[in-house]
């Protein structure tokens, strides 16, 4: 089993973890309705890329 020779300091541990943060979802504004939605997803009104794709 692998065992470290010396203990990693809190600073080294935290520097390694600095890239682990999660970003928020990427949002876009629909050109037709002006509604904010997630990228590559249909809006709540049923529009995708400016066209109506879901009929309610």
UniProtKB/Swiss-Prot annotation:
Residues 1-56 are annotated as: Disordered. Residues 1-16 have a biased composition (Basic residues). It holds the Pfam family Ribosomal_L32p. The keyword Cell division does not apply. Gene3D superfamilies: Single helix bin (1.20.5.640). GO terms for cellular component: large ribosomal subunit. GO terms for molecular function: structural constituent of ribosome. GO terms for biological process: translation. SUPFAM superfamilies: Zn-binding ribosomal proteins. Keywords: Ribonucleoprotein, Ribosomal protein. It comes from the Bacteria. Belongs to the bacterial ribosomal protein bL32 family. This is Large ribosomal subunit protein bL32. The lineage of its organism: Bacteria, Pseudomonadati, Pseudomonadota, Gammaproteobacteria, Alteromonadales.
């Amino acid at each position: 089993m692998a065992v470290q020779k010396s203990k990693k300091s809190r600073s080294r541990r935290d520097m390694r973890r600095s890239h682990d943060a999660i970003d928020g979802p990427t949002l876009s504004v629909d050109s037709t309705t002006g509604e904010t939605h997630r990228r590559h997803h249909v809006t709540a009104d049923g529009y995708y890329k400016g066209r109506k794709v879901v009929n309610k």
